[in-house]
Amino acid sequence: MTTALKEWSAAVHALLDGRQTILLRKGGIHEKRFTLADSRFLFFPTAVHGHAERVRPEHHDLLPRAGADSTEAQVVVRAGAEVVAAIEVGRPEELEEIAALHIWTAESIRADRLDFRPKHRLTVLVVRAYPLVAPVRIPRRDEHRGCSSWVQLDVAPQWGTAVHTESALARVAQRVRESVGG
C-alpha cells in the first residue's frame, strides 16, 4: 500500500507545471489537526464545487485538466511529492508574501484554511513534486470518500524526475520561514 495525500486536483497540476511549490494544510473535518503521515506520498486528486472561485484568475487554465482527474467514477493519480519542510504559520497576516508560491486566492485561504478551526495553526508544506512515469487510474471507492487528509492506495507507480531542484526548494523554505514562520 502507498500513502496518498488528498489534494485539490488544480493544485496537483500547478505543482507539476512548476507554478506551485507549497501546500497549505490544517487537517480534514474528521481529524483534530493535520499530521504528516509520511514524508513521501502520492497525490489523490480531489475536486470541489467552486474551484474556480478559489483559484486566482491567472491559473484558471488548470481547471479543465484538473476536473478530469477527479470524477465520481475514478481518479487519475499522476504525481507524488517529498516534503522538504513543514512550517507552522505564526504570522498569518503575512500569507500574502508567499502568494506567488501557490494558486489560491486570499479569500480562499482565509475561508478554507484560516477560519476553519481558528485555534489550530496552519502548516505550510514545501514539497518537491514528481510526475509519475505513467498516470494511474483508480476506481473511486467508499474508503476514498470523506474529509480526511490521507488514503492508502494499492499501487506502486514509478516516479519521474522532480519538477524543482533541491536548492530551489531550500530557497522557497527559507522564504516561507522568513515570511510566515513563527
PLM features: what roles do these ranges have?
Residues 1-182:
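Structured alpha/beta reader/binder surfaces that contact nucleic acids or chromatin modification marks
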